[in-house]
A protein has these predicted regions:
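Conserved alpha/beta-domain cores
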Residues: 1-352
Length: 352
């Protein structure tokens, strides 16, 4: 039983609830607040020197974040997902900028500032995508902007090395998101391994940091034997796997027609709350194929289904090694996992 946590406070809370590790640490949440301006500078400037300076600032900040996370979970695994969302999520809304420009113009504001805001709006508009959740995000970001995964892996490895020198036992694992073809994982795994080796040499320590991937696209599930051969672990991202299997946009369908589908019994339940049998088949296929590629592959789930008792029982039947959910759902998920294991044991006893 693991938990989803993005900061040391949630990690400590999870540990108190009995979590045996962190199944998902979302690094994009570490880029918000005061750091949002830094990532915006990286995105909006093509000058290599400016980008390099921004990445240096992010490296220092992320190293501090990981020091806190790994210290809080000393001796337990912490799966860190590299940057996943589309970059536009870190930028200002073009609509909000348009309103701001209109207000400045109405008030007779500074023309240079208005021109600057208008140029920024045009730049952000130029980065927009028709379907950003299936566009430039996940591992694709790391391939298009290789400096980003290098920075994040260096921060993870540096934090790990520093804590090892303190006599602690940090256990980070690196997760590469949204892989659809094995070549993506091969490319980014090499980036990670090369960076880890550099940090280990600089720090004079040995670093053993597993590298795995999220299985959240149908193609990844049905080619999991290929992907598993170059992964240390799989984590099934069942939120996105449900979206891409159904062809649903969760943000839209839950408000627009899922209630009607439930009322008319076109769906037996909300598939984003409890795992759908069709999606579960993809998970099962991914586990079976993944183990063909790598018999030692560790498989878990980090979507919201990890905290749903009915889904937990399904995952136990499939043979997953762990589930991960929000800290406050850990006790309920632990109970469901225990009940599933007991039911299986009693069933085995009756069979004998």
């Amino acid at each position: 039983m693991r938990a989803n946590a993005d900061n040391p406070e949630d990690a400590e809370l999870s540990r108190g609830f009995g979590a045996e590790g962190i199944g998902l640490c979302r690094t994009e949440h570490m880029f918000l607040g005061d750091r949002k301006q830094i990532i915006q500078t990286f995105i909006l400037n093509e000058d290599p020197a400016v980008r390099e300076k921004a990445v240096g600032e992010l490296l220092a900040a992320q190293t501090g974040d990981f020091l806190g996370m790994f210290r809080a979970m000393d001796g337990l695994p912490v799966i860190v997902r590299l940057l996943d969302p589309p970059l536009h999520e870190f930028l200002e809304s073009p609509r909000a900028l348009d309103v701001e420009i209109a207000k400045l113009e109405a008030a007779g504001g500074d023309k240079a500032l208005i021109a600057e805001k208008r140029m920024l709006m045009e730049q952000i508009d130029g980065m927009s995508e028709a379907n950003p959740m299936l566009g430039l995000r996940g591992c694709r970001l790391g391939i298009v902007y290789p400096i980003l995964p290098v920075m994040q892996v260096r921060a993870i490895a540096t934090a790990c090395a520093e804590l090892q020198k303190e006599g602690l036992n940090p256990k980070p694992e690196i997760m590469i998101p949204l892989v659809s073809v094995v070549a993506e994982l091969e490319k980014l795994r090499k980036v990670a391994e090369d960076t880890i080796a550099e940090v280990a040499a600089e720090q004079g320590v040995e670093l053993d940091i597993p590298v795995g991937t999220m299985i959240e696209l149908p193609r990844a599930a049905v080619t999991a034997d290929e992907i598993g051969a170059v992964a240390d672990f799989f984590s099934f991202g069942t939120n996105d796997l449900t979206q891409t299997t159904f062809g649903f946009s969760r943000d839209d369908v839950e408000a627009e027609f899922v209630p009607q589908y439930l009322a008319e019994r076109l769906l037996p339940y909300n598939p984003f709350a409890t795992i759908d049998p069709g999606v579960a088949k993809l998970v099962e296929m991914g586990v079976e194929l993944g183990h063909k590629g790598n018999p030692d592959l560790v498989c878990g789930v980090c979507g919201e289904h990890g905290g749903d008792p009915d889904s937990v029982k399904t995952f136990h039947t499939i043979g997953l090694d762990y589930v991960s959910c929000s800290p406050y759902r850990v006790p309920l998920a632990r109970l469901a996992a225990g009940q599933a294991a007991l039911a299986e044991k009693m069933g085995d006893g009756r069979d004998k």
